[in-house]
């Protein structure tokens, strides 16, 4: 049978790099930049195979496959070809475009495609058929591809998306799911969805994909073990596209996999797999499906020869084809860098938004999986299956064996074939774009994926199921069918091209010149053996130790020779002299290297590569972060036992592999001096390690060791033994015999008691590291000193007291972050003392430490500086900040060695008056109570370069000199947030070297121009928050000025800052600018100009056009008005400031009208040192939250899911980078859209939210760092290494943060979520980045914002304060001001539990009742009416309105009913300000007969009332409506047993009309006159009455209109359409009816309730009279202090 002609193929290119590939192709005359050649298998079993190079114009898409027989798919609607008839082969000259045109694939630029088809010459066709590189018309082909690339790529990817029927099948059962597999059996990387169950194994999935080969891409369904499933409904068994399908029959006995095409719409058949598994395949038939033929083999499968891709050009690096084995699999690894597998380059199309499933029952959360058992393969105990801790990887990906030492080089190409024929099909898993691990046959891919997602933080199985169906999950966890392509390997390819090659000696006439592919990769020369450069063997020539020589007999010819007895020589003729020189220089460098060090780290190795053994002279071998095991699973693979062949090996790194057991073979290497087996889940060390006599460094960190063998004592040269982060509970005794070890490294273990007796037996130990243990005490059995220990590290333990006097030779002591109250240290040789973040009240060092140079006792409780500190002669740095020190001793400044004194955040009222000459260079006294600095401070401190006296009470500055000459070298002066006036400005001229000046938020009104002119060295000035009206023009004299910050002033004239040549940042926001004058050319370095907050500023078109060239130009946007329906409850302002190296690594998010305009969303994102992650979060997070809100309404759930999905959306950027984030969402009550609002905050990292409630800060965030006990335990369980600076693997100190996926599972994105119901006492909340909260406490931040009415100015103030206090990081602050009115807040109903949570400490009085919304554990309180804090009213009401519109009068009469003393009134009821709970015997106001208006009361009209209009009942501009808004009447039966009968009087002059009240309801209501409290002002000006209307709102004539300021504020002029009018002729009739109802009500109440012990006497309506003062004072004494409502 004739072999089928090969149809062109093109791999799915990376969209981000496709344009570069096109450019490269154009440069090379149209040659394909990244070819992937498809292998055609004969349909009859003959060994022939025709291959064809892919033309460059083949667009990305599903592979057309090979033509031939019935394998060709027909176009939809095309006639069915006859059986056995071969489909027509497209003309070779037409290339890919002609083929795609026939199938209807090209929708755009058909004329260009036709031109490309017709312009191809027969010569190009013949060259393509012959296997040579095709030369095509670059103009036509590239033009067509550039136009159609997006459309074709999108259509191709749409074919890969799951259809609704696929998703419905998965959602039908929680045991089902979807994994996306890159099917490398296809001729291009193909993301194939595989539907499976939790029981489906990796072997079943791999076998099924092997059977499909490179046939048409579609969704594969593998059902797992068991008998053939019964016939399912047609809806589920239908082909997944819903239109076409085909049956898949079991494979024939010959072993080849056939695909028999069936009729359309036929359900797929069940396919048995090896081992009893059954599969169901439903490939989707598309308008352009892939061709397939029965019996053809998948590319790269068993029996197919290995391939090497053809290069893109003759000289430049080329990209490896993912459809064939990586060329680097046959390369020599001896390169200096370990180019490991990098982040995945594929960027996948996102799935459309998953539809919400209404009515889906809440699935129970699965048990929280143990981290150590989440992703468990068949591996040694404690080994993680995803490759985090343990597992097994693919083969030698960075450098695969070309030939073993005993195998001739020419046969190297057959080794891979042998391995391929013997190894079963495999499935690989890759985490966060790093190394890949081969799954064992019985591992379950879906279970692995689900466990990974649960580790991220998802809580529900159905949500994990949905996330698994998204193809974008590949950046987190990805599966491969076949060994994945290593991007890092292609980076090692230095040179490549197609040249004339000759092998052997030049004198032999047999070896003729042939054109072959030549590649210089790493340190090897690779030459293809056949013409098409992808089939057959690849000859590898090691160049290290070899030579490269010029061949003079031939032009541009070089001779490459390898070293050794079996050396080979290749002669290569280059086309140009440039290529000749390039190869000569590069190969000469490689050949001159020596084989001594090999780096194979991060190569996904599961066994040792064969070419590693080319040389036995290796001295350093790095194999870290692979999947090596004690015994490889492949029988022909080389295990760790082969390492003993390296008889000269000195250093071996096996860390972060999956050994599970100690590799005993390394004990036979006598020369080994350094061995690293950290993080390998080792549980014991064998006794054979004693044979390594020359071992000097032995690293065993990050394992599960609890003991060490006694044989270690024979390691006499061992000087370093790493035992950190294991499971030791005590110091191993064998260390007593290891006399060369001088450092005890046992950080992160489980030591509770340090037995000093054990240390005494180890006199060789000088340095003891026991940080991050659980030490509680030091046990000294004897009084003898431990004289040999010089450095002691006890950080992050649980010590309460530490007596270190027993260490009499101690030099360095670390005891930070303990619980120390007292500390005693021996000072004989003490050089450094670190004791910050404790509770120290007493610090004794004896004797005086004469060698002490550094001392940090900040963040303690010290009240004075110890006397011995002043006597320490060599002290250079003293940090006593954040204590309670009231005075600094004068002798401290006399210390000639003191250079840096940090005394901020104390209680200093003054500094020593008379200072002698001091050597202090840095003085920080910020955040104290200093009113003035010593008058001679700046004159005596002639070495002072830095002074920070911010946040004090300074009114003036001391002079720098008493004459015109000055010796001041002061360069940085920070005086922000003081009381400085204009008088201090002339004193600044005494510091001519001043570079940075911060005088923000003082009382400056002017800055004299003459004084500014003398500060010529000034580079940065911040004079914000003053009352300046202008900046002097002499600022132009400061030629080095680069930053001018002057926001929040009264500046009216734009300063001359644009004349400064070095200016970069100008901030003139929140001023009174009306116009600006600009030069013709802006300063060349200007990067930021902020003009926001200038409402009168008007810019012409020319100025705007000029300013828009600035990188960051901020100006107020024209107001478009509030969105319809948006509540006037919040407004915001935000600011951002650059940090180190002027990089802005923060971003802010503010959406005032989120979703339906009744929600808001704010966020702050901090990337620390990277810019990419914050911007990605800013652009994406709001969309993710909107999608999550469609899936769930639970605050914690949708916030958690938003952060976890964002982890996926970060893509490859989040694999190595990360960032902190805080997100705040405001949403209304879903039932009552005009009611209360809920604020939900979620954060990771150190970004935080602080709410100001009633003037006090309330933190809504939490920082997860190593000081957090629960996080510390979690990190230690994962065996992560915590460096001495408290960072996970030295990367980040936050254990919960977005990004940094390579640190999974130690670092996760699950946020802290907290929700709180907003109340009228909530004034604003602040979102800030790490830099803000590191510099400001939450109390100071809240106090600073409270004094600023404008949100933008408040955010600016926070940023300026942080910078002046010493922050050098990027800062972002968002201030959201709240205006929650009383009408939008109600807390009457109890939480579901019915129990009240405890009050928040320090925020509310203990007697206050509180309600928490859905989160009883967060401790956030909501004030009740009885607390008095709910009595604040809207500012819209005035005192005159209060006096004129109140329809009731004050009375000193007792209430008409009293409570039964034996039972409390509503013991479990919570009331809001609209419905207060009455306090017995409290001062009250009584209503005048429940009337429409006080005009009809018995007391007559008030003085300001007017006569009402006939037929309209009102009380002026306010109305009263009675509505049962809290459904209180539903509880009346329960309450009646607590109430006494109170007869109600019927009024003949007023009418009561109750909403939601019928006749039966009227007869059953109880009187609530005994359930009152103190009178309370309303938004409508009335006072809460003491009758049943406590639970209703009184009725009136006007229908209420909701206003932002008040709940029932009616218009001043009543609208006739909105009035509730009773015609005069019906008024009397209505009165009679209501009177009759009231009489019936009284009778029923008397029948239902027992008579009271003392029936109250009817009280006449009281006349207006003053209230008795004694009673009022008595009652007010019992109210909280915040209750100040005037009556």
Curated annotation (Swiss-Prot):
Keywords attached to this entry: Acetylation, Apoptosis, Cytoplasm, Hydrolase, Leucine-rich repeat, Manganese, Membrane, Metal-binding, Nucleus, Phosphoprotein, Protein phosphatase, Repeat
Enzyme class, broadest EC rank: hydrolase
Binding site for Mn(2+) 1: 1166-1167
Domain PPM-type phosphatase span(s) in chain numbering: 1131-1378
Catalyses which reaction(s): O-phospho-L-seryl-[protein] + H2O = L-seryl-[protein] + phosphate; O-phospho-L-threonyl-[protein] + H2O = L-threonyl-[protein] + phosphate
Residues holding Mn(2+) 2: 1166, 1330, 1369
SUPFAM superfamilies: L domain-like (SSF52058), PH domain-like (SSF50729), PP2C-like (SSF81606), RNI-like (SSF52047)
N-acetylmethionine carried by residues: 1
Superkingdom assignment: Eukaryota
Induction comment from the UniProt entry of this chain: Up-regulated in the hippocampus upon chronic methamphetamine treatment.
PANTHER family: LEUCINE-RICH REPEAT-CONTAINING PROTEIN (PTHR48051:SF54), PTHR48051
Subunit structure: Interacts with the nucleotide free form of K-Ras (KRAS) via its LRR repeats. Interacts with AKT2, AKT3 and PRKCB. Interacts with WDR48 and USP12.
UniProt note: domains: The PH domain is required for interaction with PRKCB and its dephosphorylation.
Designated name of the protein: PH domain leucine-rich repeat-containing protein phosphatase 1
Organism this protein belongs to: Mus musculus (Mouse)
